[in-house]
Amino acid sequence: MAGCLVPECADDISILLIDHDTASIASLTSMLQQFSKRVMSVDVASKALSMIEKQKKEIGLIIANIEMPHIDSHSFLNALLLKDIPLILINPEIKTKEPSDLLTKRACFSLDKPISNDDIKNMWQHVFSKKSQELKKINITEDQENVMDKDTYQIEAFRANLKRQRISQASLLGRRPFIDTFSTYETFQKRKSIANVEWKTTPSYAIEIENKRKEWKKSVGRRKSLWNSERHMKFIAAISILGEEDFRPKSILEIMNDPNLTHRQVGSHLQKYKAQIDQISYTLPRNESRSIDKTFEYPSNYKYPFKISDLTNNLIVSNSLWNSLEKKNSASASITQFLFKKPIGEKEETMPKFHIGGKLDLSNHSVHGNVLNKLSMNVNFVPSTISNNPAYNILSIDSSSIDSSSYTGLVSTGLSSENSPILYGLPSNDGASNTCTSQMESERISIPQYDPNQCHPHRSILETDVNQIDLDFTSILDSFDPLVDECLMKENNRFLPNPTMNLLDTDIDKMDWVSFIENLSHHDINMNHMDWDPSTANYVLPETNMNINFPEKHTNEIGWVSSQVGYVPFENMIPSEVDINHMGMGYSGGSIPPQEETNTNNVGFVSCEIHSEIPPKTNMAILETNYSNPLDWVFPEDITSLETNTIQKSLVSCETSYDALDNMVPLETNMEEMNDALYDISIEDLISFDIDANEKDIFSWLEDNGFSEENNMMESCEYHNIESVNQSDDMKIDDNFDDYRECMDWINEEMNKDV
């Protein structure tokens, strides 16, 4: 066991024993000599230091007592460190003083008294373990340097020989060799020493890379912890406050007010934020371009956020815009059909046939589609107001989506009082009101319109901005189809529009006999969509495409008839079709007694302030001289009632008692004495009623005015339907019209006779 613990090299090691106890020195020396041949002992520490300095290479182990007197621990340890000699301490049985910490830390092992042979044997493993490690490190370093030097020298010598061979073979003269050669080993060592100095003074490339990598790791960790979610939210809030065009790193940092951030850090984060926004904006348009035909741009009048109430309005607007888009696409293929003219013979065949008092069907006669596809239209018999022009017809459309207004002389035939139509630019009449006229009963002719050929594309589109006339999409019928029909009449009828004209276009220049025609319609509203009762000057002219002239044979020829701004030939006038319920209606709700049945055109107008009558045959010279004011040249006392061929116009005050009107006697006053009449004539003398008008129906009235049943083709059929509606029906919106067809051949024959 002892032989295994004690190394073989222990015999060559010199041991120095330092102890002031002579007995202890003797016993230890005898035991140490068993393992080592050279053992030296001293009793004073100073002698030991001198021996260490003199025999620095011979002493390999020092064993010292920690309680030696006169020992300087500092000097003793310095000597041991310089010599690099292992130290073993001996601890006494009774410690009189504490050993130095430096000595205990420096010592390899400690022996406690009494010391035995086993302790000496175990001591050697601690001594040689430390010494062998130090020697091994030194030997490895020296061996490596020697090997590298030898290999490098051989390589350099080989290169030099190779270079010399190349130069000799090429027989090149005057050229310096590529590589410096080392002729001797001394020159190589000199070159190596210079390279080592340079390598030690300048850091290598690998070390720089490693240092940069460590710094980068630290910066990445610091960067991740720098921009957390809270700071990023502050960053976004600062950008939203400054705006997309005005944000800068400095201004963002001022708003964030974070002392841990620098201007450079905010700028770097802002640059990354912009890059992300650009990438998103580049990706979205590219995806949208793939399905550009299938996408629909939401209008600007959508209401946000999408609440329940807003979603309904948005859906209505979206559906209406989609419907208009589909109809434009369906009509795009039929635009070229407007570019040609049909011959006269074909026009006569396709010319619409009209029957007064019956239903109309324009679907078979249309060249460019229906007027308003699947939309009911009303023909209202509206009396004239002040002039002697007979009553005329107005095509109107039931539209409950137009805002209400209180215009004088306007009548809503299919609407409630709350949804009266608005007509901008229409002149008002003195003494007339919308309330009064809305109480009148009227007769309407139902004109159902539908498209018999659903496969045929529509030939024209009525392009109307729905939002400009404030339409309520929820109240529009499902059959609404804004198509316009153009009624082509004969070219020789000068009062009809030109067949080549655009749909619903009126030539203002041709209307020279009425100067105010520009004010009859608003550019944003289709006049065919409204029911209106004209006032004093609201005449629908024969020159427009809104009226159809009805020439009659049995009309009293009275020549020129006075209007407000000019004279209209009598042959161009529309025959009067008087609704008896229109006559004599005032604010008080009373009725006027009927008049005599004469071959005259009876026109009724109601006012709450004025009452006047106009004879048909007047002295034109007198009228021209008194024409300065259309309402001042006729006075109540100047009005006469001729025996024959009179056109009576009654304006009754709302305060007049109608019971005394039965006894009225027509005045026989000469028109030349109009200006000499007194102003105090009672109103009972102004109006005469001879017959009971309630006993007259539409058929008897037509016979009296020259419209026989043979001429006007008034045979009863399942397609003829005349609706007589009263005030309560006019105030409602739920009017439903039957979809029947009819042909008004009488209009065609009457117009052909004039040719």
Swiss-Prot record:
Per the annotation, which location comes first and is thus the protein's main one? nucleus
The segment(s) forming the Response regulatory domain are 14-128
Swiss-Prot/TrEMBL keywords: Nucleus, Transcription, Transcription regulation, Two-component regulatory system
User: A biological process (GO) annotation for this entry?
Assistant: regulation of DNA-templated transcription
The record's section on InterPro entries has: CheY-like_superfamily, Homeodomain-like_sf, Myb_dom_plants, Sig_transdc_resp-reg_receiver
Give me the Gene Ontology terms describing cellular component.
Answer: nucleus
Checking PROSITE patterns in the record gives: RESPONSE_REGULATORY (PS50110)
Q: Which Gene3D superfamilies match?
A: 3.40.50.2300, Homeodomain-like
What is the annotated localization of this protein?
A: Nucleus
One example of the protein's molecular function in GO is:
DNA binding
Q: Which family does it belong to?
A: Belongs to the ARR-like family.
Q: What is this protein called?
A: Putative two-component response regulator-like APRR6
